[in-house]
UniProtKB/Swiss-Prot annotation:
Family listed: Belongs to the bacterial/plant glucose-1-phosphate adenylyltransferase family.
Name of the protein in its database record: Glucose-1-phosphate adenylyltransferase
Subunit structure: Homotetramer.
Entry's EC annotation: 2.7.7.27
Gene3D superfamilies hit by this protein: Hexapeptide repeat proteins, Spore Coat Polysaccharide Biosynthesis Protein SpsA, Chain A
Keyword Mitochondrion: no
Length: 429
């Protein structure tokens, strides 16, 4: 795998994940209590023996930069690296990244300095575990110019993805990016060609691109230079290449979830608590997911009732009830609290006992979840200060709300408390 260079696309402004992307790049959004989204593709690369990795970003990349430099520091005299490439303006390219393909085009000069055969292009906001060695092996065996990783998908979600038709040799013969209406129905295929059972094929009559591509080095360079007006892989580069190049589809059979929206992000995190076996597990010794070592103390649990939940290290929990929830590092929950169906991202630092006492005496709200508070179906971003006897339960069953000046938003019925926000004592949301 030394002949492969990985390129992870950090995505755009992350508007669908706002406000989680208000102060951070999309790949830096916390996941499962202690990880970040970027840890998934980087870990998959490392476990697949791919250690030349670029991450392309444009928005709020400071925390992502910090996380990657502290986590994936390959030392020694070798060619292993994980490096962030932020959008920049040059004499040749006076504008920012205009799309996924344009982002790669603007740094193609740097990527071509590496003596590799293939470029593996990945997305920074997917949850899955994949051995890219098998994927690359299939690409080489079929003598493909481009190979797309694909999954069968149902009609409900199909219009959110690039869809394709393939022949008996898994060659892509038609491709349409996020089709709607009649164009969507025309992309229906018999997915039993992928080896699905008749019942599975009926439920999933579409073949969707995962947004994961392998390009031969010369092919990518040629496509990007010959089509400077084309800025997106899914909308322009891939559909335009299907006639002149050998495009192959590679079926991925494991769990895969695009977590680019608040609802998908929320559901994917809480699914990790599923019993007896969650759809995705971080407990895999053969293919671990890596993240920054923080050297935090064990979580302190004082007379709590905790069911179907994941509690990260360094938390302090007192006389509370936690059900079907994920608690991030350094989470603090005071007595008589109830946390249900929620994700608490925790904190970046501890507030000392002396500081907490001074904050309370000043009539302000200390970090963490105050006594007597109830939180249901919510995402609480890092360093939030939730007062005493607060109800975050979406009392009026509102689907969408913009209350950023009050420290929260509602997306798909999920209350999202913004990073560093303060919710005063007695507030009812």
């Amino acid at each position: 795998m030394k002949r492969v260079l990985a390129i992870i696309l950090g995505g755009g402004a992350g508007t669908r994940l706002y406000p989680l992307t208000k102060l951070r790049a999309k790949p830096a959004v916390p996941l499962a209590g202690k990880y970040r989204l970027i840890d998934i593709p980087v870990s998959n690369c490392i476990n697949s023996e791919i250690t030349k990795i670029y991450v392309l970003t444009q928005f709020n990349s400071a925390s992502l930069n910090r996380h990657l430099s502290r986590t994936y520091n390959f030392t020694g005299f070798n060619d292993e690296f994980v490096e962030v490439l932020a959008a920049q303006q040059t004499a040749e390219n006076p504008s920012w990244f205009q799309g996924t393909a344009d982002a790669v085009r603007q740094y193609l000069w740097l990527m071509e300095e590496w003596d590799v055969d293939e470029y593996l292009i990945l997305s920074g906001d997917h949850l899955y575990r994949m051995d890219y060695r098998e994927y690359i092996q299939r690409h080489r065996e079929t003598k493909a110019d481009i190979t797309l990783s694909v999954v069968p998908i149902d009609e409900k979600r199909a219009s959110s993805f690039g869809l394709m038709k393939i022949d008996d040799n898994a060659r892509v013969v038609d491709f349409s990016e996020k089709p709607k209406g009649e164009a969507l129905r025309q992309m229906q295929v018999d997915t039993s060609i992928l080896g699905l059972s008749p019942d599975q094929a009926r439920k999933n009559p579409y073949i969707a691109s995962m947004g994961i591509y392998i390009f031969n080095r010369e092919v990518l360079g040629k496509l990007l230079r010959q089509n400077p007006e084309q800025t997106d892989f899914g909308k322009e580069i891939i559909p335009g290449a299907k006639t002149d190049y050998n495009l192959q589809a590679y079926l991925y059979k494991g769990y895969w979830e695009d977590i680019g929206t608040i609802e998908a992000f929320y559901e994917s995190n809480l699914a990790l608590t599923q019993q007896p076996q969650p759809p995705f597990s971080f407990y895999d010794e053969k293919a671990p997911i890596y993240t920054r070592p923080r050297y935090l103390p064990p979580t302190k649990v004082l007379n709590c009732t905790i069911t179907e939940s994941m509690i990260s290290e360094g938390c302090i929990l007192k006389d509370c009830r936690i059900h079907h929830s994920v608690l991030g590092i350094r989470s603090r929950v005071e007595s008589d609290c109830t946390i249900e169906d929620s994700m608490l991202m925790g904190a970046d630092y501890y507030e000392s006992s002396t500081k907490r006492k001074a904050v309370l005496e000043a009539g302000k709200v200390p970090q963490g979840i105050g006594a007597g508070t109830t939180i249901r179906r919510a995402i609480i971003d890092k360093n939030a200060r939730i007062g005493r006897n607060v109800l975050i339960i979406n009392k009026d069953r509102i689907e969408e709300a913009e209350r950023e000046d009050e420290g929260f938003l509602i997306r798909s019925g999920i209350v999202v408390v913004i990073k560093n926000a303060t919710i005063p004592d007695g507030t009812v949301i």
